[in-house]
Design a protein with these regions (language model features):
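Acidic beta-strand-to-loop metal/phosphate-binding motif
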Residues: 1
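Terminal accessory/targeting
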Residues: 4-117
Length: 117
């Protein structure tokens, strides 16, 4: 992902020049396409199942203890019918969710700013 999860014209140009056209990052509740690059949103750094939408989760296994692995296993078992493959998520791209994705982005950004202070 780009520094601070921001994608400007230079970042998009660098990605395209590098042949990268799919990214797991970004804000929103549904996969989307921007500047001919497909995004699967990555909103959280912990395992969390939203009641709607599609998103990926960032996890750092190198910091996990056995309890974390056990919790993750339980999460997968509990939510296995809701978990999609990467390709299945990409096939759900629908730019009709642009407004909802934008609102999600702004809400999360504001929440993170407030949390810092």
């Amino acid at each position: 992902f780009a520094p601070n999860h921001t994608y400007d014209k230079n970042t998009f140009a660098a990605l395209k020049n590098s042949g990268i056209n799919e990214i797991i990052d970004g804000y929103g509740i549904m996969p989307y396409e921007e500047n001919n690059i497909k995004f699967i949103p990555q909103l959280f750094y912990k395992v969390l199942m939203l009641p709607f939408g599609i998103q990926s989760t960032q996890i750092h296994l190198n910091y996990w203890k056995q309890k974390d692995f056990d919790n993750f296993k339980n999460f997968i078992e509990k939510n296995k019918n809701k978990i999609l493959s990467y390709d299945q998520a990409l096939n759900k791209i629908n730019n009709n969710y642009k407004l909802i994705n934008l609102l999600t982005k702004k809400i999360i950004q504001i929440k993170r700013i407030i949390k810092k202070d």
